[in-house]
């Protein structure tokens, strides 16, 4: 079965100097640098509980990753909080490789990672993010093959 690699950027905002704590986080998924912001506190806290904490130091351009990221478990919720069962398979994929993590400014970090998807999952995800089917007033989103 063909596996497709998808590049997704995760942005996080934290008040804490060292650890990203659930109550300090507004989760942001960036797909091709188009931001979709989900500030629903309970959802973000739930997702962040499954992330390995990062140590981040203000003023530095690097973040130290102490383990594998599990955010992809809830990737589908962060994209558009769907109830569609087809996205359940995508939820279960694990991030394959953290490509880079760095501080963009004092409290904002960005994580680039690779995710393996089956062709059917990718087609569905691409369809969900197609600019042609976006809601009124929302920025277009797309998935990038790498």
Curated annotation (Swiss-Prot):
It comes from the Viruses. This is Protein beta. It comes from Adelaide River virus.
């Amino acid at each position: 079965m063909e596996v497709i690699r998808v590049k997704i950027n995760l942005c996080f905002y934290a008040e804490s100097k060292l650890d990203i704590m659930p109550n300090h986080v507004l989760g942001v998924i960036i797909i091709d640098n188009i931001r979709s912001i989900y500030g629903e506190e309970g959802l973000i806290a739930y997702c962040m509980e499954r992330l390995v904490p990062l140590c981040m130091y203000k003023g530095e351009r690097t973040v130290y990753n102490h383990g594998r990221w599990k955010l992809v478990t809830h990737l589908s919720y962060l994209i558009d909080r769907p109830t569609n069962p087809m996205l359940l398979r995508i939820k279960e994929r694990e991030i394959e490789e953290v490509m880079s993590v760095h501080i963009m400014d004092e409290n904002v970090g960005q994580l680039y990672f690779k995710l393996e998807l089956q062709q059917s999952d990718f087609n569905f995800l691409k369809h969900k993010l197609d600019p042609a089917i976006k809601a009124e007033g929302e920025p277009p989103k797309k998935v990038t093959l790498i």
